[in-house]
């Protein structure tokens, strides 16, 4: 079976990670003790992708939980599904990273990373045929961003041919914990561009807007934001966890979604949007789902897809519905909005359907878009980064941990390069391909 090893790092990573396991355990009929109480063979058919089967028929998440302080881990352990995790897979330090990327990446995190790798190795060894890794983390803090990216690069060294997938929560001024978030995020993106195969950009600003505007929650809590994240994560992993044809493993998803290796930052979306604990009163129709799913208001990254063009799209529909209708609606969207899809990648929209809907919904749709509009998100961080870096504000926290200003400059220019690459493909048309190729080859050699 094609297994995935899940890792969660830092406070944010552990909170959304724990929520992810709650949601998918529920979908697969697994209770907090790891016992199966489901009612459908489909729930067990690919259970091995995320769970190990232990003695006595218990299912244990193939998850490694990492943090530089014990606090969040303790709350995961005492949370609703805290007892389902393997106790040895909790790896934590005592010092904390203090929202400092350098502490997570170079000092505190570097001391802990070997013991994390031991646990990861143990999980990987118990796999029959490991397909890859997924990490949940945030880019704004110290541990998830600094140590998370260190972990990725170490795993990349040891398992160079396995897929590396991240769910990365991008900071935003609206929901901000620390003033140095732009530094931490830029240093992290610098790593993600080089070392991951697929990164889902989940953006607190977009989540906040969805809670506020669509769900009419006046003061959204992290719990409300995480509810949206877990719905989205459950959606994008559906194809990996349930039997199906399309994007059934991480590599196939990457092949369909990533036209150029550096441009692997996806914008997830979800429909219908529901708030925590609410029930849906009527099932949506397939046209409504499709329309909502492509709506800018449903995107989990604060970028407007209408400001860019889609390179590739994957859609996952869940529930009992007519495949024919789904295909018709998806074609309909593409035909009506053809200017928003690049014409030099034909058939760049792929659709999968899974019979099992998420809890509390009759049908749902999850959206994964590789859009050039994601550059807005990187521009936003880059502007904040530059504003502080120009004045060398807060730099001593980083240089004090042994970092060099040079590294900041490199990260800044790598992020700006990423923005211009997206822009280049946004402007590209099928006709001008000739002159385009020569440039490309020149670039490749330079890189």
Curated annotation (Swiss-Prot):
The alphabetized list of GO BP terms reads:
microtubule-based process
Q: Which cofactor does it need?
A: Mg(2+)
Amino-acid positions noted as binding Mg(2+) in the UniProt annotation, renumbered to this chain: 69
Keyword annotations of the record? Cytoplasm, Cytoskeleton, GTP-binding, Magnesium, Metal-binding, Microtubule, Nucleotide-binding
What are the subcellular locations of this protein? Cytoplasm, Cytoskeleton
Q: Which InterPro entries match?
A: Beta-tubulin_BS, Beta_tubulin, Tub_FtsZ_C, Tubulin, Tubulin/FtsZ-like_C, Tubulin/FtsZ_2-layer-sand-dom, Tubulin/FtsZ_GTPase_sf, Tubulin_C
**Top-level taxon of the source organism:** Eukaryota
Q: GO CC: one term? A: microtubule
| Main location per the UniProt record | cytoplasm
Leader sequence residues: none
Q: Segment Disordered: which positions?
A: 420-447
So where does GTP get bound?
11, 69, 138, 142-144, 204, 226
- Residue ranges with Acidic residues bias: 429-447
- Return the SMART domains for the record: Tubulin (SM00864), Tubulin_C (SM00865)
Molecular function GO terms recorded:
GTP binding; GTPase activity; metal ion binding; structural constituent of cytoskeleton
Q: What exactly does this protein do?
A: Tubulin is the major constituent of microtubules, a cylinder consisting of laterally associated linear protofilaments composed of alpha- and beta-tubulin heterodimers. Microtubules grow by the addition of GTP-tubulin dimers to the microtubule end, where a stabilizing cap forms. Below the cap, tubulin dimers are in GDP-bound state, owing to GTPase activity of alpha-tubulin.
Per the record, the similarity remark reads: Belongs to the tubulin family.
Q: What is this protein called?
A: Tubulin beta chain
Q: Which organism is it from?
A: Paracentrotus lividus
